[in-house]
Design a protein with these regions (language model features):
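Residues forming the flavin
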Residues: 1-254
Length: 254
């Protein structure tokens, strides 16, 4: 939706704002590591600002005793995570997203294409799949292979290809992720364990948004921009509420 909306705006001469993207990994570790938090908080969320670059890295989308999964978006495979209500489908691991936010400056204006390119590199290196790597192997500058993964104390819930994330993820984002993992280790010891698994690539897009007044596009009477695709919300519930709000607004005016 966001790409179609951006294309429509370009065709109609409507300027857009927002030039950032989140790129990172899906972290998987034994559920006991974050159990103290997950038993009290439905979804722990933490933001961390790196000392090296001053970038924001965020932990979110926490799945207690869940599974890592793949997503296919227009032929590009990325990773995600979920957990099942059915107790029989629970796992021994928990997973969460750990993404670094990068805001681009002029003249670059294609952050979504940038993220898709990074993800496609992981697809290329893995032979059409996604990658998984132990944190310890990543920090020691070596690839995780099938033998090392089999010996890992954390066993993967997704059949990803063991590999080297440093071959596809930009250094800046990778540095931010490693630094954040060690900061999280101070909160939940064991987070930065050698056998903590990192799956890549995971991306979250920030849709470009137009200038609006009460969600009506500036210079375009009776044309409204709302929801995730227009860059105003970041979830299904927010987008639905945004639609209801604007609908009430239109009805009150008429």
């Amino acid at each position: 939706g966001s790409r179609n909306f951006s294309k429509w705006c370009a065709q109609n001469g409507i300027p857009l704002q927002n030039n950032q993207v989140d790129i990172g990994v899906r972290v998987e570790l034994p559920s006991i590591v974050w159990e103290d938090f997950s038993k009290k908080i439905y979804e722990p969320k933490i933001w961390y600002r790196s000392k090296g670059y001053g970038d924001k890295t965020r932990m979110f989308c926490f799945n207690e005793r869940g599974s890592v999964v793949t997503e296919n978006t227009d032929g590009v495979l990325t990773v995600n995570g979920h957990s099942y209500r059915d107790q029989s489908r629970k796992t021994e691991n928990s997973n969460f997203a750990l993404l670094s936010t990068i805001r681009f400056t002029e003249p670059f204006k294609q952050p979504i294409d940038y993220a898709r390119h990074v993800a496609s590199l992981a697809n290329l290196i893995s032979g059409g799949s996604v990658l998984v790597q132990r944190l310890g192997d990543l920090e020691n500058g070596r690839r995780t292979d099938a033998k090392r993964l089999a010996n890992s104390t954390t066993q993967p819930t997704l059949n990803a290809v063991p590999g080297d994330l440093s071959l596809c993820m930009p250094k800046r984002q990778l540095d931010n992720i490693i630094e954040t993992l060690h900061a999280l280790d101070a909160v939940a010891p064991g987070t930065a364990n050698y056998d903590t698994l990192l799956y890549g690539i995971e991306c979250k897009y920030y849709s470009a948004r137009p200038q609006t007044e009460n969600f009506m596009i500036s210079g375009c009477k009776n044309i409204y921009a709302i929801g995730d695709g227009a860059g105003f919300t970041r979830s299904l519930s927010q987008a639905a509420a945004n639609g209801l709000y604007v609908a009430d607004q239109i009805c009150s005016e008429n």
